[in-house]
Amino acid sequence: MEDKESLKLQVLTASRQLFMSKGYENVGMREIVAAVGQQPTQVYRLKLSKSDILAELILDLNNKQIAQLPKVLSKIKDGSILEKIVKYIEIQYKFDIENIELRKVGAVHGWSWSAKYESKNFEQILKLMQPIAQWMNEEGLDDVNSRCVGIFSLYYVGFRGAVINNFSAAECLAAIKPSLIYFVK
């Protein structure tokens, strides 16, 4: 089992490098197999399609983002609910901009993931939205889940600025802040 996990890690590492250097669309499974120096049957036994590999990479990136939450939240102690959410979103934008190439590929090709991966991705999104939900509950706001879905959607509207126009985290935030206000009233 350890060999299988080791091979999976090698496949994911090689795939990320190939996707980032050549583009997701330009990389095939044969190239991934060659990059890890294994026989095709060994890699195919992992039962990972190219879209599964991408999903695994995105889930790993999300886990890294989630692991940073205690550190992130330690920086957000005071302020109004809007100020806390703004600071939190700006920090998340910085993380996503640091990882923009992989985020771009995930946004374009995430539609091809299986329901299993989409479910895991959604669970991670809920974990990332938890601090905002907590602040809203503490503030006594109603319909917190719907507000969080709205903020998550708005987040990606702002992130498009980074993807398309090379916006900084502050510029992404400035693009959505006027609309963000409506979710905390």
Over which residues does each language-model region extend?
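Short secondary-structure transition hinges
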Residues: Y93-A133, V163-I164
